[in-house]
Amino acid sequence: MNPCHAVHPNSHQEWRNLSIFSLPPFERAVRCIKYYEQLHTPENHPYVGYGHRIQPGEKYNYSMSELQADSLLRSDLLRLCVLFRDFGRDSLLLATLSYQIGPSKLLGNAKYSKSIILQKLDKGDRNIESDYLKFSHWNGKHIPSIRRRRMTELRLLLE
């Protein structure tokens, strides 16, 4: 099963009483992101919903409903899954990480070199946990809450 396959429940009530590990991987990723991001407010500009960065020409605002924010998150995460689809079963984990840090920090560009994680995966080496946890910094400082998030992502999504 493709871990990036989005499964939409008939209602949010259907998911409420289930263990997170009984949920499909995509739903686990959504829940994890929502838990750590929370709904953004005007102080979080240019981010809305659950961490969507407003792009030029987009007209999102902070009055969006939780359902609209959820839909936007799922759309963004699916787009990132497509970007990392060549990494197969690791595509959802990479998409989830890039949702927060941006895909260029993994894929590389003029400012960043290709991440060690992707270099290892390209060679078939899936021993990426320690490299994944290195993405626990903000403004050059190690942030314990970000490390907890990374550990949670690994536990929920690394197969």
Task: Describe each region flagged by the PLM.
Residues 92-105:
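Short N-proximal segments of mature Sec-exported proteins
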